[in-house]
Structures are given as C-alpha cells and as structure tokens.
Amino acid sequence: MATYAIVKTGGKQYKVAVGDLVKVEKIEGEPGAAVELSPVLVVDGAELTTEAEALAKRSVTAELVEQTKGPKIRIHKFKNKTGYHKRQGHRQPLTVLKVTGIK
C-alpha cells in the first residue's frame, strides 16, 4: 500500500502522495521555493496516524511550481424595472504544488 497524507491548506483538505501535482489556494512564494504543509492524517502502508501528538512530528514537503489563476467566473446582477445591471468577473489565484516528501 502506498504512503499518502491528507493535508489542510486554504481551508480545504487534499489527499496527496509523493510526486502529485496539487492546485491549492494561493500561497505566497516564488516558483522553486519549498513549502511545508501540516498533515491531518497520514497513511503509511497499513499504519494510520491521526493523533495530534504523532502528527506534530510528521510533515509534508512540497515544491512551489507556479502561481496561476482558476477559470473565469462571471457574475451578473440585475434588478427588474429599474434598468440596473452590473457585470463582473473573477479569477481565483491558485498555487500549483508538487509534493516532494511525506516524513
């Protein structure tokens, strides 16, 4: 069984294994920088770790690959009979991480 971890970043949880590319909410940093994420759960073969004391000793390291943006979301506000309408767009900033190790 492969080793994987559940990490929490940006208010969301992601299942990651070594070598995975993951798009997460924006993390400040330059491409090539090392990022350390705290795991919520670690599975190493048949061994499952969820206790806070044991997880404090574990860490997930990742390399920041690039800063990018998500797909465009279009917002249109409209009020009937007044001629009011407003168009707006939004692209969420994202960070692409490559998981390099689970310790």
From Swiss-Prot:
GO biological process: translation
Family classification: Belongs to the bacterial ribosomal protein bL21 family.
Name of the protein this chain belongs to: Large ribosomal subunit protein bL21
NCBIfam families xrefs: L21 (TIGR00061)
HAMAP family: Ribosomal_bL21 (MF_01363)
Superkingdom field: Bacteria
Keywords recorded for this protein, A-Z: Ribonucleoprotein, Ribosomal protein, RNA-binding, rRNA-binding
Complexes and interactors: Part of the 50S ribosomal subunit. Contacts protein L20.
GO cellular component: cytoplasm; ribonucleoprotein complex; ribosome
Stated role: This protein binds to 23S rRNA in the presence of protein L20.
Database matches in Pfam families: Ribosomal_L21p
GO terms assigned for molecular function: rRNA binding; structural constituent of ribosome
